[in-house]
Amino acid sequence: MAAMMQKSAFTGSAVSSKSGVRAKAARAVVDVRAEKKIRVAINGFGRIGRNFLRCWHGRQNTLLDVVAINDSGGVKQASHLLKYDSTLGTFAADVKIVDDSHISVDGKQIKIVSSRDPLQLPWKEMNIDLVIEGTGVFIDKVGAGKHIQAGASKVLITAPAKDKDIPTFVVGVNEGDYKHEYPIISNASCTTNCLAPFVKVLEQKFGIVKGTMTTTHSYTGDQRLLDASHRDLRRARAAALNIVPTTTGAAKAVSLVLPSLKGKLNGIALRVPTPTVSVVDLVVQVEKKTFAEEVNAAFREAANGPMKGVLHVEDAPLVSIDFKCTDQSTSIDASLTMVMGDDMVKVVAWYDNEWGYSQRVVDLAEVTAKKWVA
């Protein structure tokens, strides 16, 4: 049901009250863990960087301590764009400029630095444990490795990695394979985070022979507001005026977290004039004969079990805006599940390509933190 979808506290939904006993217990947990938190820096304070900070701020008992942000715009831009967001609305937190190199979020001070060269960042002197790499630029071993050269211990790339030997993780699918010795990891793409969980269910329950995917995806900052030069001639066209066919590696990338599917999936993207929330349309041939109700039952079992909080099954006839700021990686539109000839399965799944993805970045960062303090 729509009412069951998890919403963040700072999108306007009510927060349930806790008893005094529970509140004291929660504070005790925080006190115990405080000295064990890892120090986190965000490199690139764009859409994912700011969504990540809001998601992190909404967590309780987190093992992450965000202490620095590298943003070329400085404190004025960082504080203003964090507080006021055209998609997310006004941040309920108290965001202030402390001085020319610090902002505060509900009293929590965060240092703002500005350098386009990761080698010049003060990660060593700040004892940074983990860098959230959110620029979309430093996504290979050489680029991301510059953060480690600058003194950070680890890097989490918020995009598909360019080097095959950088491990990729999708929470709900293969995060259990994470090892503390990995210096650089990738959280894959937002579309892979939507696709991989329910594809895993299909593979385990029915066996996938082959398939294709189309993601109808909200426009992103990589596109042009008006027609202008771009390496992709379709993305060169005005994003708010067109449906823009383009490439996506999301389907192929599923095999990075589900090796049994290597060579079995492919797909394309259609960029559309909406600011956030996208939808995947997957068609696969399966080995085991099935029917729509059985497919949805498999999704419900996963949503109530091992993929709780990552996968959601929606029965109401909703539209894209209804999925804005949903915490899950993927919301199956149950009424649109189809089976043709008992072995061709069509699944439609919604996802907030900014918010839901950023929640998984926080989750994966927490996975690394738990290995640190174990």
UniProtKB/Swiss-Prot annotation:
- Which CDD domains does the UniProt record give? GAPDH_I_C, GAPDH_I_N
Active site positions: C190 (nucleophile)
What broad class of enzyme is this?
Answer: oxidoreductase
Q: Which first-to-last residue range defines the signal peptide?
A: none
Tell me which residues are marked as the site Activates thiol group during catalysis. Answer: H217
Major subcellular location class: plastid
Q: Where in the cell is it found?
A: Plastid, Chloroplast
Which Pfam families did the record assign? Gp_dh_C (PF02800), Gp_dh_N (PF00044)
Q: GO biological process: what's one of them?
A: reductive pentose-phosphate cycle
Oxidoreductase listed as a keyword: yes
GO CC, sorted alphabetically, is: chloroplast; supramolecular complex
Q: Does the keyword rRNA processing apply?
A: no
**Which Gene3D superfamilies does the entry link to?**
Dihydrodipicolinate Reductase, domain 2, NAD(P)-binding Rossmann-like Domain
EC number per UniProt: 1.2.1.13
Keywords, comma-separated and alphabetical: Calvin cycle, Chloroplast, Disulfide bond, NADP, Oxidoreductase, Plastid, Transit peptide
SMART domains annotated for this entry?
Gp_dh_N
Residues that coordinate or bind NADP(+): R47, I48, D71, R116, N353
* Gene Ontology MF: a single term: glyceraldehyde-3-phosphate dehydrogenase (NADP+) (phosphorylating) activity
Self-association or partners: how does it assemble? Answer: Homotetramer. Component of a complex that contains two dimers of PRK, two tetramers of GAPDH and CP12. CP12 associates with GAPDH, causing its conformation to change. This GAPDH/CP12 complex binds PRK to form a half-complex (one unit). This unit probably dimerizes due partially to interactions between the enzymes of each unit.
Q: Which family does it belong to?
A: Belongs to the glyceraldehyde-3-phosphate dehydrogenase family.
Q: What is the official name of this protein in its record?
A: Glyceraldehyde-3-phosphate dehydrogenase A, chloroplastic
Q: What is the lineage of its organism?
A: Eukaryota, Viridiplantae, Chlorophyta, core chlorophytes, Chlorophyceae
